[in-house]
Amino acid sequence: MRLSYSRAWVGCCAVALAVIAGAAVLSSATKKTAFTPRDKAYYADQNTINFVRPGLKITIVSAKIAADGTLSVDYKLTDQDGLGLDRLGVTTPGAISPSFLVAYIPTGQTQFVSYVTRQRTSTDGKITVTQATGDTGGVQTQVADGEYLYTYATKLPKTYDPAATHRVGMYGSRNLTEFDLGTNYASAVFDWVPAGGKPTPREVIKTVSCDKCHDQLSFHGGSRRGLELCIMCHQPQTSEASAGQTVDMKVMAHKIHMGSQLPSVVAGGKYAIGSTDWSTVVLPSDPRRCAECHESTTGAAQANAWYTNPSRAACGACHDNVNFATGLNHVNLPQVDDNGCASCHIPKGELELDASIQGAHILPQESATAPGIVINLVKVDNGAAGKLPTITFTLKDKAGKPIDPATLVTSPNKISFVLVGPTTDYGNTTFAGVTTPGYVSEAAAALSKCGQDGTCTYTMTHAIPAGAKGSFAIGVEARRALVVLPGTVKQVSTQYGVDNKVIYFSVDGSPVVKRRAVVDTAKCNQCHVRLSLHGENRNQTEYCVFCHNPSNTSGTVSGINFAVMVHSIHFGDNLATAGTTYKIGTADFSDVRYPAFSNTGRPGDTTNCQMCHLPGTEAVFPIGMNPVKAPNLLMDPAPATTAACAACHTTRSNMAHMAAQTDPKFGESCDVCHDVNGQFSVIKEHAGK
């Protein structure tokens, strides 16, 4: 890659190179450990790395309050290796403009209050609100290379409480686009008690919990990162001006994540902050799964606050049809304050689905009363071309007790086996007597034969095609009905499924080859918690691809090959930019807002392939893969790599490029440029930091 440096940088090279030579020469090994394939700097040549020293880290060393209320903070600006950076961008490229916050938690309270606020008025002049904000006009002093002292312009009041927990926060950016290295962002917080002692900051959720779905929690242009910084302003003190509603984190976050399921939205209203409408948000998991955000394993100091400290603000954010003043939708019990909440809403009661916090948020299909269903596939006999394969499997409940398959005959109970192959590429094998593209599914409950130990056999009624070659696979799905709290006013009828299992076998005596693994169900469940579809039947990506293969479509509307479908659904509302949509039957996924945040702080960023992909699988397909039926794409059928990429890259110019690189005789030439080691490898082109 050839870089063109500005005249300003050519003029100061002598100074810069002297500094760099003495302090910042990095080895190739250091480069690889300092950056990831998600970073633009990972792909820069070593000379550029040595010269620019990309990256930005902010470290707050200390904070002090003088007798007259003057606040100062000692901080460091460093690159990825911890070497100091020039704030002004003279001796190291990229000027840095840090911003500063300060807040405290009043004694006896639990949320931050900012010392610095501003007033904002709505455009019609009818609403004026208070907002926490950052300090401006302070004085910067350099202490050492990369170390600075900032003295706030805002003085703390004489009545400030030195025994209270205080927090200073910083955020900033470093623009390195001149070197094709993007913009680096960073933030930091520092807690202390001015009078001495251990601070007790608010810590209900840690950023690591947010990042499971959001990848990198960042807002307001990208530099404000991490929940620890967010809650300094997003607390009860702050409201947005357009409608005067609070942007307190516990209210705002609950409402955004509840989104389309808010009672007020279901009733026809909307939830918006300024001009951004969050009413279409569909949480990737069930919003009753409070513990997926409120994780007890992260070390958050108040991780259990969600069930030990209920409040009208937090609970009413999701349950926004409750009127606490009148008691409407609250069993006619008005609540003038939060003092009585925990009297009824205890952490956990004796029964599921009761008024306790944890009980009320249980998903019926995950009830502890469910006996469970566990299936293991043991072996396949008679699995040769032209034969009827017999599957040996175990069928038990979670306590290890055998399940009679006769109890699974009547819907919604079931057990079914699906046969598919070859594993090199599903979707093009024709099974006699069925119209399903590339696979055959059989209900097995009535014909399964089981012993007293729960070991069963089932013989498929459809044969493996006579000319079949290579490896085939058989997968299982099963489901049981469940009634929770039968005979009570809380009775709920539901169903739950087994974890799909897959077994591979050779139909021609050749070595068994499993189907390629591209994504990992565990990665899906980082966001979806339990990816379970089609009536609690299908929950493992290894099994999903049986049916979601290159030959399968949703009528004449869309291709449902797994790569096309998942890319299209996750790309969601980005499709509108290209003037396209993605539908499966009547379900329109064009308003899906992917939860990952871009480097500039906006949701809908789909560039981090490894949020779903296994390492190294975000790559072009080998030559010779089956074409993909995809009515939603401009090319139908589409070559394998084209189909996967065009699900996101949907424009006509994108498609023209892909078509031009596909020869009718020799196929796609994507690997020439986009292979793992290509100049424009897939992962390199998706690097966004």
List PLM regions with ranges.
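N-terminal secretory signal peptides that target proteins for export/translocation
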Residues: 1-7
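Low-complexity, acidic Ser/Thr/Pro/Gly-rich terminal tails and inter-domain linkers that flank the onset
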Residues: 45-66, 361-384
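Bacterial N-terminal signal peptides
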Residues: 12-22
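A eukaryote-biased signal for short, well-structured alpha-helical docking elements
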Residues: 27-51, 335-369
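Long, contiguous interaction/targeting segments characteristic
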Residues: 9-12, 25-27, 220, 278, ...
